[in-house]
Amino acid sequence: AKPVVGDEPFGVMLADDLVDAPSSCIGQLTARREARGGGSVIAVQDVAPEATNKYGIVSVDDTSLQTSQMRGIVEKPDPKVAPSRMAVIGRYVFEPEVFDYLEKVTVGVGGEIQLTDGIASSLDTVPTYAHRFEGTRFDCGSKQGFLDATIHFARKRGFKIN
């Protein structure tokens, strides 16, 4: 993607996260980026403490704010050591400099290259913000999440489902 993106900020949407929102999640992140004069912005939502080991979890300057500067991010931490309950969902607006950090990432949690590791290594030089987006997120990477999304959107379109 780097040759296509060039020197422009860009959005990333992970396919297993489906969002129903009053305005697009990427649009919300872009608006926050513009309001702050630049920087990367990552969508987050609060999760139950026992669920932190299923997500990338961020640490921020102020957990009470809708948008706050990130200070750290860890992939799937044990609930006992999670820095917050703010979980990353699959929506991002990045500055192009993030590619420089992603190119240096090695295999991480689960034997995979983790986007989280690239973000973590960029935090000292690329201003990065966590934003609690407005809307509902469905994890369509799980059977239950896919079913929940299907029922939600069917009901929203007027289908009667018990």
Where are these regions (language model features)?
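Conserved beta-loop-beta/alpha segment of the NTase-like Rossmann-fold superfamily
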Residues: 1-60, 94-96, 102-105
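Catalytic-core segments of class I nucleotidyltransferases/pyrophosphorylases
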Residues: 11, 30, 34-35, 62-161
